Amino acid sequence: MPMMKLKYALLLSRIPMLALGQGDYEIVDPNLFYPREPVTPYSQPSPNATGMGGWDVAVARARRFVAELTIEEKVSICTGNGFPANPSIPHHTCQGNISPIERVNFTGLCYTDSDTGIGNSHSYGTGFPAGVTAASTWNRELIRARGYAISTEFKAKGVHAVLGPVLALARVPGGGTNFEGFGADPFLTGAAGYETILGHQGAGVQAEAKQYLGYDGQQYNRTYYSSNIDDKTLHEVEIWPYAEAVRAGVACVMTSYPYVNNSQASQNAYLLNDVLKTHLGFQGYTQTDWFGLKSGVSAILAGLDQDMPGVAFSQTDNNSAWSYYGANYTAAVKNGTVPEWRLTDAATRIMTPYFWLGQDRNYPSVSLEDDPRRSITNAQRQRHRMVAREVAAAGMVLLKNTPGKKGLPLVKPTAIALFGPAAGQNPYGPNQYGLGPSADPANFELPLGYGPTPLTIGIGQGTLAVGGGSGSTFYPRLEDPISAIQQRANQDLTLVDWSTTTNLTMASFVARRATACLPVVASFSGEGVDRNLSLLHNGDDLVATVANNCDNTIPIVQSVGPVNLEAWIDHPNVTAVIWANLGGQELGPALVDVLYGAVNPSGRLVYTIARNDSDYAQPHIMTTPQPYPQLNYTESISVDYRGFERNGKDPRYWFGHGLSYSNFTYSDLVVKTHAGLSESLKQPIQYVADAPGGDSRLYDVAIVVEFQLRNEGPWDGTEIPQLYLEMPPEAGNPTKILRGFDNVQIRDGERQNVRLFLTRKDISYWDVVGQTWVVADGTFTVLIGASSNDIRLKGTLII
């Protein structure tokens, strides 16, 4: 496979076969792994869209439209017409394209990354915080607002579908694309995905839930490994977020690269036909990840509706005729191998969201350019910058604090000093994170570092606003911590100094002269790039050096995921720690908001931070080629915090942890069943989908939980109460599981009543024998806490 231009190969493309380690580049021969065409049996024909759940009008319109098309035209709707590198597509436009059909006034479809803003082009759009940051707000309203703002800009640029949100769980902490998703828990991921989809589609843009299924973030061999998942885990953990996406009315579900139980995801009939289209009642369409298709007829019959980008990765001339779909699809229909009704339904499903969202009426023309001098439409809005800043601030997690004369919030400090490359701007520009001194891969290293020594040079110049790959975006502006803090410090006549090198002697010198020291450290990964759990540029040494010379050291961690903090977290001079996640273009002002108390921190971790890397249930990622690599989900449903609890491991910071400048107390818990249930809770029901998301009875409110929250001060603030559930032994769930949360704003000294609801599905387990959701007999324990380990209230209910 030839290397592409570097910015696509490392930052912005979908790389199916890139293995990176210790600064090396290795293109893996696919023939080392799976045969090219494993045949997947399918259990039933792909079901037609029915129009249930309010989709009936759109489905009817799509059917009338498709009825006018020829076989070739229907196939063209199901087959992308090339990757942006295609020289016939000027100035690098959409990541995926469906050709127009002029005779029926269809102008085509445009698909583009990313879920942090308009990606892969200098398109004058806002650079939003990453998915992991949005989830860290635990704020449904704000998550939806982010999705709406992103897609408002997509629509202004004429894009029909945003390639997100990512609903894959951060199962492996070092997985390269974990930052694109919403963390390690299926319930939280489902809730964040639900709100994001409502935001995107509320703006009139199609959302795509990805990557379905068995994609745990790790990049090495990602197109060839098999994720082997037992049935209980499949339904209770992996599929859970996608059920929420379907319930939100998601337009498209994108399949993943890996195999699932040794059946390639894009031709896995059980996942596509049985689970998604039948049991969940999905009315939209399925689509491959880019270059993710490995078969034609098998995938079509298994329920795969659309191939993207419609050409083979190896076809540098983007010959659209070379595709598993395209002309081969047409031939398969005409010779009877594929029934035409299957093609008709696929095209109907693709067109249904187009009509459902009104994209056939006065939709803007595509205005995406790789050259900013050619851009026609500036999609930025001041209110979008405000949303980006609010999400970035609300997504920052205060891990540690010793309030008073030291720690946070800052109160007119005499002298502030910032340290490390991540504190300032990248000398090569805000959109060149990773390019280093030249565009030659030999000139810089990657943060994979599987050996014991963290990498100290190379990529990672400047402040880290987002991870790499197709989940990133270009920034029209990027305000770093130094610039933002200088502006705020000027109000107090505070001296501001900095050292953005990795020189520890200089850091020592600068630290001794400051009353508040802020080392800014980072951990980077991206599509095609996994990582270890160490900080870039010997960040541990930087923090320790600063702390040895400054008695008020406040590290700021910009990270794509968990890192090991043990080298310095207990240092007596480390008075506070801000986990900044990935803040997007407004990260600097958002950081100032939290540091100075304009925003009382309310972010919570969406994964657990371990004391030892080996304490994670799945600590390792593949680093060497293996024949037929198998990833066995041996932890079963015990993901993240559940695994730590089950295995008796005490992490540094538990899932859901986060401090505030205020103190909150919990009281007066009441747990009761809901009077409006449609049927007895104990009755195992054979559920049949009657709405997108599955049988509507699953979403009956079963239990109502009420309690009191009081803000003891001294600040107005926001608390994130979390509801965990322990089920009876029959359910087979060995630990508590997240089943609810809220984002409660309370003034200093005030009290507020909080009410949370548990649905029938929330309190059910997946019966692998009966193949249905069942409510166990016995005692349910409801736990209300400030994190997965900080439980404040406990109640029980016998069912």
Feature names for model-found ranges:
Residues 790-799:
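Short beta-strand elements
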Residues 21-766, 779-784, 788:
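Glycoside hydrolase catalytic-domain context in secreted enzymes
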Residues 771, 776-778:
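A glycine-anchored, Pro-Gly-centered beta-turn/N-cap motif
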